[in-house]
């Protein structure tokens, strides 16, 4: 007997397709004439990097599910993993068309500003000679050209790196495949044309043009640039083993991610279908995941264009947003004790408008304050040179008890967090790594002081990471309070984390997985009740995404 399939709710949308709609709005900003031109370049690059990560994580997850013997269905639209992947690919192809149109618009609008990205066929004879000399001296010595054979198997293609691929023909008519890595830190990606200031050529296009110099014995029948995106959905639950060090196991798992199966392949030109099929066979990828791109395969070069524009003087400032720096909050007097001020009143910091330095200064003050006995904190994503970590290290070196939960499973920040966990441990901090089956995404800090009144708490609860860089970019709130009922409950949260447990009951804090959804539902019910009684009722929610079906239905 077949299992009855549930019909999708008409007001719900598939999570993955909803995300693609969000990323389309990012792309729309790249085409928005009301946005300064140089900033539109940023939006174009963000759109592409967002899509890369989406394929690495979300499509990677769906493809893992497709390999399972059990059919997994999405709980809102009842779509299978296979149906979702097909819908994603179809939507991506439509977005690729839109991306190409917007890219051409951007390039056209850059020309009056003195910026051009050109191909070799747009160069004069003299310019071509100059670039040939540049290629011979600055690029060719660093290239490793591979002709695929029994002696030289198909090379491993790195995630998101650009390669030149060519179909070669011998004098006898036999064909061979060649692969050349085009990404190298030794030579520049954006090559300037000396005779034309503001005119550039991408290094991979120069490599593609001069392939005949690398394969002198062959005729180049077909050539293109290619780029693959690999699955990055590592299964961290496999490393929970009493007999192995969790951090070392996580480090090994992150290394394995670099060799996971590809989920997408992009070409810069239409090429022979047999060659595409051959490459797909080599890398074990479905040909339906192959895309043809009319724009450069990696748009990160736009930041070099922005730097060039900034160097052109004040007249180009109109192409950028007016620079705004976070201010120090007027709620606190920075030259006076922050602890004493917070004891008198709560402080709500609003990023990026206010500076996270007020919080880092509080941590440094706590590290040096004799009344502070402990600092406990959860860390998810940190800045490259983290003042937060430095303050915690100083606190530990000053004899404070410092307990830090470092979430090693913060995707793409695993290696950074592994290094920070070592630094904290070496300073004398107690470092823990979270709970099996659950990521600790909370942003919670608890400062405990021993005073004449007994133990007193200062608690910080935030919506954003403890990251000095992203706090200048993302809108987040950070509450710092001396309310003891909040501090006591935060202390219980940390006690549970240290025991490897989730908190079962809370009164003032909303803590997933057991004390968040039910409290949100209660608050929604309260507003429904107010509305039914013709009283003032309002629900305002600011979140990155909403996928909880129960809450969606309640709303």
What do these predicted ranges mean?
Residues 543:
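Short, small/polar-rich loop/turn modules that mediate ligand/substrate recognition or access, typified
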Residues 1-539, 548, 554:
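N-terminal localization/anchoring segments of enzymes in phospholipid and broader phosphate metabolism
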């Amino acid at each position: 007997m077949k299992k009855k399939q549930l019909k999708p709710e008409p007001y719900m949308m598939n999570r993955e397709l909803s995300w693609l709609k969000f990323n389309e709005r990012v792309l729309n900003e790249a085409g928005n004439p009301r946005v300064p031109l140089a900033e539109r370049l940023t939006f174009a690059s963000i759109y592409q990097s967002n899509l890369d990560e989406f394929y690495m994580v979300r499509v990677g997850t769906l493809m893992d599910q497709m390999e399972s013997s059990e059919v997994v269905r999405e709980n809102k639209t009842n779509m299978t993993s296979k149906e979702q992947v097909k819908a994603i690919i179809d939507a991506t192809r439509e977005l690729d068309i839109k991306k190409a149109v917007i890219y051409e618009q951007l390039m056209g609008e850059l020309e009056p500003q003195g910026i051009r990205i050109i191909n070799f066929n747009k160069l004069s004879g003299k310019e071509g000679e100059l670039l040939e000399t540049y290629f011979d001296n600055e690029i060719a010595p660093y290239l490793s050209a591979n002709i695929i054979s029994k002696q030289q198997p198909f090379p491993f293609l790195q995630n998101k790196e650009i390669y030149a691929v060519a179909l070669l023909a011998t004098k006898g008519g036999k064909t061979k495949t060649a692969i050349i890595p085009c990404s190298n830190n030794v030579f520049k990606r954006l090559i300037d044309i000396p005779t034309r200031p503001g005119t550039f050529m991408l290094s991979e296009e120069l490599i593609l043009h001069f392939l005949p110099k690398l394969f002198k014995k062959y005729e180049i029948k077909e050539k293109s640039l290619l780029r693959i995106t690999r699955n990055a959905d590592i299964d961290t639950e496999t490393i929970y083993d009493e007999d192995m060090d969790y951090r070392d196991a996580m480090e090994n798992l992150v290394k394995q991610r670099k060799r996971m199966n590809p989920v997408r392949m992009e070409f810069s030109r239409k090429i022979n279908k047999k060659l595409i099929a051959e490459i797909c066979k080599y890398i074990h990828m479905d040909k339906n995941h192959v895309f043809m791109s009319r724009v450069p395969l990696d748009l990160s070069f736009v930041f070099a264009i922005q730097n060039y524009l900034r160097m052109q003087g004040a007249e180009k400032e109109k192409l950028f947003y007016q620079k705004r720096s976070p201010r120090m909050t007027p709620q606190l007097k920075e030259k006076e004790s922050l602890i004493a001020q917070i004891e008198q009143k709560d402080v709500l910091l609003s990023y990026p408008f206010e500076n996270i330095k007020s919080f880092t200064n509080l941590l440094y003050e706590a590290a040096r304050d004799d009344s502070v006995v402990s600092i406990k904190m959860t860390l998810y994503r940190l800045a490259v040179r983290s003042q937060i970590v430095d303050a915690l290290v100083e606190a530990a070196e000053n004899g404070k008890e410092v307990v830090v939960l470092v979430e090693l499973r913060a995707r793409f920040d695993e290696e950074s967090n592994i290094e920070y966990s070592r630094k904290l441990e070496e300073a004398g901090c107690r470092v823990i790594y979270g709970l099996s089956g659950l990521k600790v995404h909370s942003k919670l800090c608890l400062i405990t002081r021993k005073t004449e009144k007994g133990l007193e708490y200062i608690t910080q609860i935030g919506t954003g990471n403890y990251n000095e860089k992203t706090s200048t970019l993302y809108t987040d709130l950070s509450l710092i309070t001396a309310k003891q009922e909040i501090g006591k409950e935060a202390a219980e949260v940390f006690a549970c984390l240290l025991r490897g447990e989730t908190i079962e009951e809370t009164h003032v804090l909303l803590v997933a997985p057991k004390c968040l959804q039910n409290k949100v539902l209660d608050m929604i019910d309260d507003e429904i009740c107010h509305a039914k009684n013709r009283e003032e009722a309002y629900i305002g929610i600011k979140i990155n995404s909403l996928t909880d079906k129960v809450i969606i239905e309640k709303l």
